[in-house]
Regions:
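Phosphate- and other anionic-substrate recognition elements at nucleic-acid/protein interfaces
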Residues: 2-15, 19-150
Length: 150
């Protein structure tokens, strides 16, 4: 059962990693719900750590989840390698577990969801990164439910 995530990890912060910005969502394993909370700017994939420190301080997550933008054939892309490095940095900086998950279709799904909610399609001025982060986290929550004592 090495793949089982500890029940102690209840509140999870997720990231849709990007070169220009990172979408962020928070979720609860108890309710299996996730909500987009914000989007922070990044310079060539590096976040503003001071800004991120404030968000982590405010939300107090037990763990992190970072979406890996793999190639469609499942192999690592340059961006997924960067996202993996970011995940490792989160763990090192905040001392909390950081997980990664395949997020190949999350941006597409986020755009579809945004369109359903009336998004006009101007993704540069009105990005969907936090919706993508929410979808990434929702997927992770469904794959990692709290374990019940049988």
């Amino acid at each position: 059962l090495s793949g089982v995530v500890s029940n102690k990890l209840k509140s999870i912060m997720s990231f849709d990693y990007g070169k220009k910005r990172h979408g962020i969502a928070m979720g609860q394993r108890i309710t299996q719900t996730a909500n987009g909370i914000t989007c922070i700017s990044a310079k060539d994939g590096k976040p503003n750590w001071d800004e991120l420190d404030k968000i982590v301080q405010e939300w107090q997550p037990d763990a992190f989840v970072v979406g890996l933008p793999l190639n469609m054939d499942g192999t690592a892309s340059d961006m997924s390698k960067r996202a993996n490095k970011f995940s490792n940095r989160l763990h090192g900086r905040y001392g909390k577990p950081s997980f990664t998950i395949d997020e190949r279709l999350s941006t597409f799904a986020a755009k579809e969801q945004a369109k359903d909610l009336g998004h006009k399609g101007h993704y540069k001025s009105d990005p969907v990164d936090e919706i993508a982060a929410q979808i990434i986290l929702q997927t992770w929550l469904e794959e990692n439910p709290l374990q019940t004592d049988d």
